[in-house]
């Protein structure tokens, strides 16, 4: 089924003759507008009632997008925004020692540490990672195991935590962070990656489940997390590292599946394989996939023309869902499985994914 979908996608792309949309002023203006809306509305429009800490994983995804876009565009409010949040919180992580979500904001701390070399930015995230490595979680790699969330037993975790350990190895020179990351990433992927489809299950609860159309259940954003994570890790690991080829092969395998699941308008959906039940776009997934595809094209890993076309189409579709004020719609709320979306739904990780995509599109 997977090979058939991919071949059909290649044929459709070859026949469509869709011209590549030039990156330029308009793309930069839209991305700046999205960034500014996120800054102006931070802490509002939450998909779950109540308040949210600055160290929440959803914000961590936004901070990464902000800093990535700032590096490329020079749009200073993005970096100033993340710096201000880090400083007012003393660069602290979330409360849960082992939970991958609660170290996600460490990505922003380390990205800023690489620039400013302020020890205050490094200390809390390093202490957290050192503690996890020194006293590793003693549980199975299974979401339903006792304390199962203490390991990377759900696919989102592969975005939240591994980039932190990879960056720590780079900034400290201690390869122990990378060794820990590799062990846990491999174990998680052995459990959750479906080699036949080239996609990740969200967690073990979805093994054997089927969508209404009979296809396996592969969550759009969940696979977006994983695909973006692979691009980030490949950007962080030295090419000479013995594990680099593993991540490269995983990225290439997923890339084929990702383009096969893109719809005719350029979007991805809440479910990767059931667009009938979920006919609407899902723009956190679309943002992460567009980022990964454009990143792969820019780094020379994705050389077939189909990938550049898919990235351009993904970007065009994303931009069509940005309002005049910079609000990005059709972003699925916090959850762990495919859910229907609408134009009014938005979330910070959608904005973060959009800005990550923009950072590569303008260079493509």
Positions of predicted regions on the chain:
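Extended ligand-binding groove/face enriched in aromatic
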Residues: 79-83, 91-206, 212-216, 325
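Bacterial Sec-dependent N-terminal signal peptides
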Residues: 1-24
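CBM-like carbohydrate-recognition segments
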Residues: 9-11, 23-60, 67-68, 72-79, ...
């Amino acid at each position: 089924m997977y090979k058939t979908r991919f071949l059909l996608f290649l044929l459709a792309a070859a026949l469509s003759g869709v011209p590549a949309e030039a990156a330029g002023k308009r793309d930069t203006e839209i991305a700046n507008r999205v960034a500014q809306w996120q800054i102006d509305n931070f802490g509002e429009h939450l998909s779950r009632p109540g308040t949210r800490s600055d160290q929440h994983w959803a914000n961590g995804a936004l901070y990464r997008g902000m800093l990535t876009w700032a590096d490329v565009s020079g749009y200073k409010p993005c970096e100033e925004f993340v710096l201000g949040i880090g400083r007012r919180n003393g660069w602290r992580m979330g409360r849960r020692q082992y939970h991958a979500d609660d170290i996600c904001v460490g990505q922003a701390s380390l990205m800023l540490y690489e620039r400013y070399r302020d020890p205050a930015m490094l200390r809390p995230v390093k202490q957290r990672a050192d503690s996890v490595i020194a006293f590793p979680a003693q549980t199975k790699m299974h979401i339903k195991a006792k304390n199962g969330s203490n390991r990377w037993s759900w696919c989102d975790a592969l975005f939240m935590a591994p980039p932190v350990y990879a960056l720590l190895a780079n900034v400290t020179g201690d390869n122990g962070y990378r060794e820990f990351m590799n062990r846990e990433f491999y174990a998680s992927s052995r459990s959750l990656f479906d080699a036949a489809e080239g996609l990740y299950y969200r967690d073990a609860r979805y093994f054997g489940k089927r969508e209404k159309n009979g296809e396996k259940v592969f969550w759009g954003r969940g696979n977006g997390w994983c695909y973006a994570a692979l691009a980030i890790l490949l950007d962080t690991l030295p090419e000479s590292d013995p594990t680099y080829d593993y991540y490269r092969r995983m990225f290439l395998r997923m890339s084929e599946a990702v383009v096969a699941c893109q719809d005719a308008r350029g979007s991805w959906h809440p479910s990767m394989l059931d667009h009938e039940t979920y006919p609407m776009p899902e723009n956190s997934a679309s943002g992460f996939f567009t980022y990964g595809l454009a990143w792969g094209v820019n780094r020379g890993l994705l050389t077939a023309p189909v990938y550049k076309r898919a990235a351009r189409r993904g970007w065009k579709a994303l931009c069509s869902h940005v309002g005049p004020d910079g609000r990005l719609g059709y972003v699925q709320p916090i959850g762990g499985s495919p859910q229907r979306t609408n134009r009014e739904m938005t979330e910070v990780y959608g904005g973060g994914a959009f800005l990550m995509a923009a950072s590569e599109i303008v260079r493509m």
